[in-house]
Each structure stands twice: as structure tokens, then as C-alpha cells.
Amino acid sequence: VRPYLVAFYESH
């Protein structure tokens, strides 16, 4: 999993 995708998913 990409870090930026994780950040986006977690931030949502």
C-alpha cells in the first residue's frame, strides 16, 4: 500500500 494512499485513506 502506498504511503500517500494510506494518508489519504486515513485522513478521509
Swiss-Prot record:
It is an enzyme of class 3 (hydrolase). Optimum pH is 8. Active from pH 3 to 9. Keywords: Hydrolase. GO terms for biological process: negative regulation of mitotic nuclear division. GO terms for molecular function: RNA nuclease activity. Its EC number is 3.1.-.-. Optimum temperature is 50-70 degrees Celsius. Activated by Mg(2+) and Zn(2+) ions at low concentrations. Inhibited by Ca(2+), Cu(2+), Fe(2+), Mg(2+), Mn(2+) and Zn(2+) at higher concentrations. Has ribonuclease activity towards yeast tRNA, polyadenine, polycytosine and polyguanine, but lacks ribonuclease activity against polyuracil. Has antiproliferative activity towards L1210 tumor cell line with an IC(50) of 41 uM. Lacks mitogenic activity towards murine splenocytes and does not inhibit HIV-1 reverse transcriptase. This is Ribonuclease. It comes from Pleurotus ostreatus (Oyster mushroom).
